[in-house]
UniProtKB/Swiss-Prot annotation:
One of its GO terms (molecular function) is receptor signaling protein tyrosine kinase inhibitor activity. It catalyses: Random hydrolysis of (1->4)-linkages between N-acetyl-beta-D-glucosamine and D-glucuronate residues in hyaluronate. A lipid is attached at N448 (GPI-anchor amidated asparagine). Keywords: Cell membrane, Disulfide bond, EGF-like domain, Glycoprotein, Glycosidase, GPI-anchor, Hydrolase, Lipoprotein, Membrane, Receptor, Signal. This is Hyaluronidase-2. It comes from Mus musculus. It is a lipid-anchor; GPI-anchor.
């Protein structure tokens, strides 16, 4: 049944009211202490030694690679083969570790997690970002479409094999129940276990939450970027996941179809807004930090994002109040001298100047509007306002030695700049601070909240034994 106009309007009103209300405090920045972190997680480590093309990445707060063989990084990605016994079907359709989650063994999976985590994150300190990248199936049954339908088919077959006399509708309902229950147990208890092993890290699943707003392909002329109402409701079905996560990692990879169009900003904006909505909804006293995955290039080929699309991705994410962006890439980005040279030129000419601009603009806004105890968030999420350094007030100057910043701003905020920030942005305070400009110190209360937050990591293991004992092998 198609949703009517009434529910859509109601949802829109709820979202606007939620945005207009007081922002919950969030975790303080990690790594550099900046309100907006920019991370480079692209496997370009071979550009210098193999292809003789060194890349200057000093402007990034974090440098890491998602490739195998690298440990103790500030950002760690756990793919399906790096964390326990993730049930899935491979590309040939062969069942691996049971295929569907209800056919997997949580009893065998959980004990392997400690070894997996300690292999890639070898020390407790310092904290970092830990991203679980499990994309083979989705925990909401109806979202397993197209090539993921194999998980629904297999689930139905398992039920039908046990109950050959059941009608198809009963088989389907039971299959959905068993799949969603098992998927929840696998994801939930994995999160609980790994948080207990490395409690200083911020843990979450890549691409959660998703917005499913890719309908620009079919509806280019009428495309708005809004998340379908039904998908927002389905995200709320995952309240158990958001309650256990300590960070959210949505993705805003741009297809070249969207290049430099008004749709690119709408596509990104509503995906980030949905993540921020989820971040504020499922914890009573704090909001989860949101780190947005993006790419330095469009999803097909090696064409760097245009200036317009850098604003639509990095700039939009910063203005909406995300904690940072993570640039991800694959081995093709550094597969030859030509690709490395292209990235080198792109970094120097376009990407680095822009991220330095935005990073410092968010920092200045935090200092002047939030006493350095919070990050600036756009008052109107739909407004065409950004955290950019005013070219009339600042210029970027290069460092002259490797120990100096790659680029740094020179200048100061004008009265007009300060008025602009005050008019268009408000503060989201870090835990321990409150007030309109984060001027009130609540660190005693925040300490209790932080201990409760961290304590949930340590106590979560208590429930795992019971789950494991009742798991159907």
């Amino acid at each position: 049944m198609r949703a009517g106009l009434g529910p859509i309007i109601t949802l829109a009103l709820v979202l606007e009211v939620a945005w207009a209300g007081e922002l919950k405090p969030t975790a303080p920045p990690i790594f550099t202490g900046r309100p907006f972190v920019v991370a480079w997680n692209v496997p370009t480590q071979e550009c210098a030694p193999r292809h003789k093309v060194p890349l200057d990445l000093r402007a990034f707060d974090v440098k890491a690679t998602p490739n195998e063989g690298f440990f103790n990084q500030n950002i760690t990605t756990f793919y399906y083969d790096r964390l326990g016994l993730y049930p899935r079907f491979d590309a040939a359709g062969t069942s691996v570790h049971g295929g569907v989650p209800q056919n997997g063994s949580l009893c065998a999976h959980l004990p392997m997690l400690k070894e997996s985590v300690e292999r890639y994150i070898q020390t407790q300190e310092p904290g970092g970002l830990a991203v679980i990248d499990w994309e083979e199936w989705r925990p909401v049954w109806v979202r397993n479409w197209q090539e993921k339908d194999v998980y629904r088919q297999s689930s139905r077959q398992l039920v039908a094999s046990r109950h050959p006399d059941w009608p198809s509708d009963r088989v389907m309902k039971q299959a959905q129940y068993e799949f969603e229950f098992a998927a929840r147990q696998f994801m939930l208890n994995t999160l609980r276990y790994v948080k207990a092993v490395r409690p200083q890290h911020l843990w979450g699943f890549y691409l959660f939450p998703d917005c499913y707003n890719h309908d620009y392909v079919q509806n280019w002329e009428s495309y708005t970027g809004r998340c379908p109402d039904v998908e927002v409701a389905r995200n709320d079905q995952l309240a158990w996941l958001w309650a256990e996560s300590t960070a959210l990692f949505p993705s805003v990879y741009l297809d070249e179809t969207l290049a430099s169009s008004v749709h690119s900003r709408n596509f990104v904006s509503f995906r980030v807004r949905e993540a921020l909505r989820v971040a504020h909804t499922h914890h009573a006293n704090h909001a989860l930090p949101v780190y947005v995955f993006t790419r330095p290039t469009y999803t097909r080929g090696l064409t760097g994002l245009s200036q317009v699309d850098l604003i639509s991705t990095i700039g939009e994410s910063a203005a909406l109040g995300s904690a940072g962006v993570i640039f991800w890439g694959d081995s093709e980005d550094a597969s030859s001298m030509e690709t490395c040279q292209y990235l080198k030129n792109y970094l120097t000419q376009l990407l680095v100047p822009y991220i330095v601009n935005v990073s410092w603009a968010t920092q200045y806004c935090s200092w002047t509007q939030c006493h350095g105890h919070g990050r600036c968030v756009r008052r109107n999420p739909s407004a065409n306002t950004f955290l950019h350094l005013n070219a009339s007030s600042f210029r970027l100057v290069p460092g002259h030695t490797p120990s100096e910043p790659q680029l740094r701003p020179e200048g100061q905020l004008s009265e007009a700049d300060l008025n602009y920030l005050q008019k268009h942005f408000r503060c989201q305070c870090y835990l321990g601070w409150g007030g309109e400009q984060c001027q009130r110190n609540y660190k005693g209360a925040a300490g209790n909240a932080s201990r409760a937050w961290a304590g949930s990591h340590l106590t979560s293991l208590l429930g795992l034994v019971a789950v494991a004992l009742t798991w159907t092998l």
